[in-house]
Amino acid sequence: MVLLQVKRGDELIFLYETSVKEKTDTVLRELVALHNGQLKIQRVCMEIEELAEHGTMVPPEMIGLNEEQREELKLKDVWADKCIPSGGFTINKDPLLRRNGQQPTEAMQKVLAGAMNDAKAMVDRRLAKSSKTLTPKIVEEALNLLRGGVTIVYPMQLPPHDSIRMEFTNTEDLTGTQASKEVIEPSKAQFWFAGHQMLMGKLMSDYLGHNDKTKVVVKLNQIGEGPPGREAVISDPLRRQMMAEAYRRQEELKKLEQDDDDEYLNSSWADSGSLKRQAHGLENVRFRFRK
């Protein structure tokens, strides 16, 4: 199987296994679904943190209004009495005025926290550095963990306008949010290899060759974003090492310019036999003669 190191910009977001015989359309569609799935889980977890602190969301027309304003406008959250967390709640008002302030019990908060931690661990971008691949099944299992945790705490479900429930039913509206800039629209998706766009209607082998045991970097973006930057020819650690070596050499040359004698002949790089001794492992060999 070909191992794709999938990046968004310069960030490695996950590893994905495929075949050189697979169609580019199929691969791109799945890569976009995995990327957007990662983002969905991040968004849901952020909202569940708020749910554990301040309860369910108030209706859209009440968001941002304090109690006096709601009373003045005769607005009431009819879902507050229907969507009560298991074990009851305590009042913890939401400073952002988005949620009803009915905080679940400590035990139920732990249920939500456990589901969040497990789900985030399953799709963590750092897994790519541990050579662990991401699959649609893993993303779906992570979402099911979150659904299960929320259902335990809210057996009567969340209000239909709650952003968590909307995420679960894929009816979320991200218009005007920062999240909307991160999500890739499938119809506008592109992916690139070695500075070249991988076009639809092709096979992966058209770009990667027929070796099914290789590892390559591909980059995701959208129409209008332009070609992503090429991968660096050398890695950052190697680049830093080369710069340090160049600096050391420069300092040594400066020192030689200040010397009036032949001290440079004592330097290892000036010894014509040094490279040969290194190749044969004789660099630090010393001979001791007995009388």
UniProtKB/Swiss-Prot annotation:
Coiled-coil annotated spans: none
Organism superkingdom: Eukaryota
Pfam families (alphabetical): CFAP298
Family matches, as InterPro entries: CFAP298
Single biological process term from Gene Ontology: regulation of cilium movement
Annotated family: Belongs to the CFAP298 family.
Protein name according to UniProt: Cilia- and flagella-associated protein 298
